[in-house]
Amino acid sequence: MEKLLNELSSENRPAYSVDSDVEIDAQIPENLKRSSGLGLPSITENDLSRHFTNLSRKNYALSTSFYPLGSCTMKYNPLINERVAKNEAFNFIHPYQPGKSMQGVLKIMYELEKDLCEISGMDCFSLQQAAGAHGEFTGLLIIAKYFKSIKQKRTKIIIPDTAHGTNPASAALAGFGTVSLKSESDGSILPEKLKKILTPEIAAVMLTVPNTLGAFEKNIPEISRIVHENGSLLYYDGANLNAVMGIVRPGDMGFDVMHINLHKTFSTPHGGGGPGSGPVGVKEFLEPFLPVPKIESRKSKFVLNYKKPKSIGKLKAFLGNFPVILKAYVYIKSLGAEGLKNVSEWAVLNANYMLARFKDKIDVPAGSRCMHEFVLSPKSLFKNNVKTLDVAKRLLDYGYYAPTIYFPLIVEEAVMLEPTETESKETMDAFIDTLIKIIYEEATQEPQKLKEAPFNTSVRRLNEVEAARNPVLKWKKA
């Protein structure tokens, strides 16, 4: 395991030296001097360079291997996006500049909003949101402000058990209570069941389409009808939009509010905490409630309009995570409408190919067809107290990033896989063969080996319970 910089430090080894004919220490007044040292590591530039190079070699990334993390859309990120984002014309812009001096930036954001409207079927967008959950929160604040404006007190949100995992937290943060809706065995929502819990208190129903089992919600027209008859709104969680671009549009299906994860569907690097971008789209009647400022085109110029009296206000400093916005813009312009449709078709094809190879060997809770991702449940195959966690840890030894496990919560010992459109048949076959080998051979013949895995990583299996209960989050000098 790589040592920390503080552990590599030596008090007797100067990190740098500067020739000077001035005694710098003598120039600082005594009352401004520190009484103790800063505690910064003293390390040579050579050792510092080696330290970070060694750390980089331990990284796992899309540029190194397959990343089948379900519900995360870990697709290849075209390097042309990075080249444009690093252009000095963008990097040297300051977010506090007046709008008239950054017309190019505002034009890109304005055009991206229009592109997202075309892709989604929504009428207006805000690009301010920093992540998907931030987008959910924004959408729910818009819903709350809308009902307040028409003097209706609606305090609850219906969330199916197949919804994206952040939905309940976003609803709570926005001041709503939540009502859970149990899905059917294939992950679908029965309109009759939904109708029974649609009361005057319900502000909205949040749906993830396709859902977290990888199934497309087949009853959306009926669901939309009964939700709107109740006076409620329909929210689309766009976490899985990569499955349906150019095929169906949420706005055409009856959804009133949605968010899109640019960092997932539109190929910007994500993971490790960000940066992300979760733009929010709404139908025309909700446009007045979007966050400020709104980018508008006036007489061939782009302006930032803060004069929106019904707006929920500003939710992020500046105008959003612009580098992510820029990369998504390049991705959309590079592919065009037909290219984006092909992305979704290939994503669904790849997922169904993998599912077809797995379905006769491992239980598939939601059936033999899927959209862009699917969930396996190897519970019935496990003997000797082997768990999904053990299989995931063992995959690391074979050079794979483990898929999403134990989600969705409605599937026991869940393994969630999303290959995306950018993986080859050979890559998928190699992963499938490895996972089957671990479950069918190693879990039966060498269960203890699985329970002790991984063996080839720089950090072995951690005591996750101890780490959660007694976290050590900072270095202390011995």
From Swiss-Prot:
Cofactor(s) the protein needs: pyridoxal 5'-phosphate
EC number: 1.4.4.2
Subunit structure: The glycine cleavage system is composed of four proteins: P, T, L and H. In this organism, the P 'protein' is a heterodimer of two subunits.
Residues recorded as bearing N6-(pyridoxal phosphate)lysine in the entry: 264
Substrates-to-products reaction catalysed: N(6)-[(R)-lipoyl]-L-lysyl-[glycine-cleavage complex H protein] + glycine + H(+) = N(6)-[(R)-S(8)-aminomethyldihydrolipoyl]-L-lysyl-[glycine-cleavage complex H protein] + CO2
Keyword hit for Oxidoreductase: yes
GO BP terms in the entry: glycine decarboxylation via glycine cleavage system
PANTHER family named among the record's database cross-references: GLYCINE DEHYDROGENASE (DECARBOXYLATING), MITOCHONDRIAL, GLYCINE DEHYDROGENASE, DECARBOXYLATING
Functional summary from the UniProt entry: The glycine cleavage system catalyzes the degradation of glycine. The P protein binds the alpha-amino group of glycine through its pyridoxal phosphate cofactor; CO(2) is released and the remaining methylamine moiety is then transferred to the lipoamide cofactor of the H protein.
Lineage top rank: taxon: Bacteria
InterPro entries: GcvPB, GDC-P_C, GDC-P_N, GDC_P, PyrdxlP-dep_Trfase, PyrdxlP-dep_Trfase_major, PyrdxlP-dep_Trfase_small
Originating gene: gcvPB
EC class of the enzyme, as a word: oxidoreductase
Pfam families assigned: GcvP2_C, GDC-P
Gene Ontology annotations for the cellular component aspect, listed alphabetically: cytosol; glycine cleavage complex
Family of this protein: Belongs to the GcvP family. C-terminal subunit subfamily.
The entry's keywords: Oxidoreductase, Pyridoxal phosphate
Protein's name in the database: Probable glycine dehydrogenase (decarboxylating) subunit 2
Any one Gene Ontology molecular-function term assigned to this protein's record: glycine dehydrogenase (decarboxylating) activity
